[in-house]
Amino acid sequence: MPADDYPVTELTKALIARPSVTPLDEGCQTLMAERLSAIGFNIEPMVFEDTTNMWARRGNEGPVFCFAGHTDVVPTGDVSRWHTPPFVPTIIDGYLYGRGAADMKGSLAAMIIATERFVAKHPDHHGSIAFLITSDEEGPFINGTTRVIDTLEARNEKITWALVGEPSSTLKLGDVVKNGRRGSLTGNLTVKGIQGHVAYPHLADNPIHKAAPFLAELSQMHWDNGNEFFPPTSFQIANINGGTGASNVIPGALDVMFNFRYSTEVSADILIERVEALLKAHELDYDISWIFNGLPFLTGDGPLLDATRIAIRQVTGYETDPQTTGGTSDGRFIAPTGAKVLELGPVNATIHKVNECVKVDDLEQLALCYEVILEQLLC
């Protein structure tokens, strides 16, 4: 069968054609639900404010294997820079172009096709298969996966293994899987001063001058050495804003936003304690608030990682490399429940860019990998 005609290709195209920019779903989950319902899944829509979520499950017993993903996509950017319209899926030279092709409608289609094939071969499979799908992964992540997990936890419905379809691969399909992620902690700091005329500094108090030594020391601090699974904790200043825009006014306040990506060697509480101790040491007048974006998690050797290694080896012929690098994903909301979480998806070279694309052959290989993982865990 030509790659253009693979069922996974056709389903990916159907999903791309729905312009589901966060928090819109545009019928993607309805399309998925129709396919899953036809093979015995119970479909449970969970709509929270502007976000569409779906919990679908086949089976009532454990263990529970869950495909997790998102139907929302990031904005297209300047449409004139795209080779083809971003929501008109187009195949050129073996690549399928369109917003969401790699992140992550290709993965969603591969999950559906793999599950259909698996259920057809193993209608009486062990345990349960579930889908946790949201339209709020690329946005504020308030009413998406985290709300679904809260609902499941409230009724003691547990996920044993979760496979997130984030585009984990770097150079070729399956060369990298994410078996963990660093924690993410954001600080919003306001350093207070006294506004005044630059010609009369003795009548003002410049918060930029006051904060500069603190920020210099903070940016040079050593947080930890990392470990065999995680690189050392990193600190980055993301935004600094101060002043009125005029050259003759000393500002009354300085706003700084910064972020930690931290390993399992430290906790958010330790990072907060060290930052606030340094603020006090510099005798700054300040307000600070903290946003917890996710705890670090790690899935070590065990059934899920073993099954994924076997699947990638069997389908591609090479070994995968488990890593914890990169940004956060919705896996950070699933892992605290005790579930083992992995991420496996297409090559990520074009995600969030203009001309986002995925290799058509990779979509079929990804579906095959997902199917083998199901067989390894539920047969």
UniProtKB/Swiss-Prot annotation:
Zn(2+) 2 binds at D103, E138, H352. GO terms for molecular function: acetylornithine deacetylase activity; cobalt ion binding; succinyl-diaminopimelate desuccinylase activity; zinc ion binding. Pathway: Amino-acid biosynthesis; L-lysine biosynthesis via DAP pathway; LL-2,6-diaminopimelate from (S)-tetrahydrodipicolinate (succinylase route): step 3/3. GO terms for biological process: diaminopimelate biosynthetic process; L-arginine biosynthetic process; lysine biosynthetic process via diaminopimelate. InterPro entries: ArgE/DapE_CS, Bact_exopeptidase_dim_dom, DapE_proteobac, Peptidase_M20, Peptidase_M20_dimer, Peptidase_M20A. It holds the Pfam family Peptidase_M20. SUPFAM superfamilies: Bacterial exopeptidase dimerisation domain, Zn-dependent exopeptidases. It is an enzyme of class 3 (hydrolase). Catalyzes the hydrolysis of N-succinyl-L,L-diaminopimelic acid (SDAP), forming succinate and LL-2,6-diaminopimelate (DAP), an intermediate involved in the bacterial biosynthesis of lysine and meso-diaminopimelic acid, an essential component of bacterial cell walls. Belongs to the peptidase M20A family. DapE subfamily. Homodimer. This is Succinyl-diaminopimelate desuccinylase. It comes from Shewanella baltica (strain OS195). The lineage of its organism: Bacteria, Pseudomonadati, Pseudomonadota, Gammaproteobacteria, Alteromonadales.
